[in-house]
């Protein structure tokens, strides 16, 4: 593990995620904002989500998809301070993304999207450096496969 995404940064990311992730309807709103931001960066990315009705981010199928993705992200972020659990979560997600053909490009869209929507939820307490470090050094390398 790296100094940049060290124990303090991991704790900050965990706490900030817990606050932003919130409960119920807030999660749906956060999800919609995130995917809108991703599709605004690259409208062709929508095509990857045909199976879950990506053309309508308010559809029940897409809401269920967002909940699954957030669930996975929540498990990864929650285990940032527990290396063996973290590595198992990342490997599980890596395998899933290989099966779905999700590329590094999509992870970059999500990284940029999170950096856009999380400050809207968290205001000044959003720690951009900690999030960037933990995404770039831990989360992304653990999931990417291309």
UniProtKB/Swiss-Prot annotation:
Gene3D superfamilies: Globins
Keywords: Disulfide bond, Heme, Iron, Metal-binding, Oxygen transport, Transport
Extra facts: Giant hemoglobins of worms are formed of a monomeric subunit and a disulfide-bonded trimer.
SUPFAM superfamilies: Globin-like
Family affiliation: Belongs to the globin family.
Protein's name according to its UniProt entry: Extracellular globin-2A
Molecular function GO terms recorded: heme binding; iron ion binding; oxygen binding; oxygen carrier activity
Assembly notes: Disulfide bonded trimer of chains IIA, IIB, and IIC.
Disulfide bonds: 5-134
GO cellular component terms listed in the entry, alphabetical order: extracellular region; hemoglobin complex
Sequence positions that bind heme b: 97
Signal peptide (UniProt feature, chain positions): none
UniProt domain Globin: residue ranges: 4-146
Domain of life: Eukaryota
């Amino acid at each position: 593990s790296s100094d940049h995404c060290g124990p303090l940064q991991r704790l900050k990311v965990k706490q900030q995620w817990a606050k932003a992730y919130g409960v119920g309807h807030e999660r749906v709103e956060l999800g919609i904002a995130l995917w809108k931001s991703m599709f605004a960066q690259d409208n062709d990315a929508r095509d990857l989500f045909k199976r879950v009705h990506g053309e309508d981010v308010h559809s029940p199928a897409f809401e269920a998809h967002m909940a699954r993705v957030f669930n996975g992200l929540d498990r990864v972020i929650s285990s940032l301070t527990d290396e063996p659990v973290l590595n198992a979560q990342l490997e599980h997600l890596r395998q899933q993304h290989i099966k779905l053909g999700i590329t590094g490009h999509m992870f970059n869209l999500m990284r940029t999207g999170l950096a856009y929507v999380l400050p809207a939820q968290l205001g000044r307490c959003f720690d951009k450096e900690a999030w960037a470090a933990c995404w770039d050094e831990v989360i992304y390398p653990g999931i990417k496969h291309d």
